[in-house]
Amino acid sequence: MNKRGIIILCIIATLLCIGLGANFYFMYYLNAEEGQLASVRALENMIRHKIRHLKPAYLNRNPRFFMFRNKLLKNYKQSAYENASVLWEIANWWPHENEIYPLYDSSMGQLLKTLREEPITRASNLARGTQLKLLLRLSQQQKVIFKPQWYPRDIVIEGVVYSGKDRHVAEVYAFYLGAVLDLRWTPIVVGRVVNLKDEIYAHGDQELQNTIKIEVDDEGKETYCLYGKCHYCNEEETICGDEQHNIEGVIIYIVPGTLAKRRSPWQRTYKEDKRAVWEDDMTYCKALKNKMETIRLLDLIDVAIFDYLIQNGDRHHYETREERVVLIDNGKSFGNPYKDHLDILAPLYQCCLIRKSTWDRLQVFSGGVLTEIVDRLSKQDALYPLITDKHKRGVERRLLVVFAVVEYCMDKEGDKMFKTL
């Protein structure tokens, strides 16, 4: 065979090798991807099976509930106060690491009433972030954040889990839920009806006043509409007062101290055509266990359980205070009462770890009493009822899923999944 023929044969052989290699590569990763998706589906099926066969203890009321209920109801009952400045000092002294307020303190009821009633002395835009917020000053120059209402209680937010604007009542519900579950990592929040004309515009700085439209109809009647200043704020989307210029919203007590912002290991891509690695890799947590402190991992698992109950799938970043995780910004919750986005629980079912204290506390509120106690605690709030019955049923349904996932993990890991850190 001449030299030219040998060269042609070599080229053909090389092309065949490349083709076979590419085919092997493609098939390997296709099979791997199919295997990952199959493992996700298998997990979902396993959890459904576990839910159907949950022990009666998860379905019935825990006798210990009544002891916790009475203490909580007493602690969070709003009560009269005399000196707001003293309460501000107490609340600023409360935080320790990520615990924003104590388990029980007689001043809590007074503080809630203070946040609801103290007059607004100054208002300005709070431009940071994607959502409309205002920075208010109450008596004694105490700063608080105000988030206004965008949606009625019964709206169903369609689409992906992070769709829509913030739901203001979700912040109040998160506060009470955190208190019940002893995850006292949220800011203290109360509902409040404010007057857009007399309390916000009248006490607003020039920049805020420039983001409030005043429309006058043919009869000379004024309507005040706020659009504010933020990443997504614009003049086409406004919040308008009613006939008395009132709007609903929530007052969020600003957590004292320095907060550090960190990217969540379970962050979504926020692209419909691209999934994050953790969404398909059920072994994702194995590497995290080697590079993340166990206490931080346990914090994030607590957060995942909390977020799953209220369906907050938008915690792309999380904040820490003194190196412990806090639950800031809970507004993207309670979007669709009919959907349960299981992947919010990924930290739990991928790591199969949970604090023993968290697990014990969850079981106290079995049998439908979790939403019952939050409902009773929030009865004095200005925005009661905070959520609809459909959303309450959703919370109770998801608590059963949490129980089922822990049972699934116990089958895999046994008692070593429970940690005391």
Q: What residues fall within each predicted segment?
A:
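Phosphate/dinucleotide-binding and metal-coordinating scaffold of catalytic cores
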Residues: 1-421
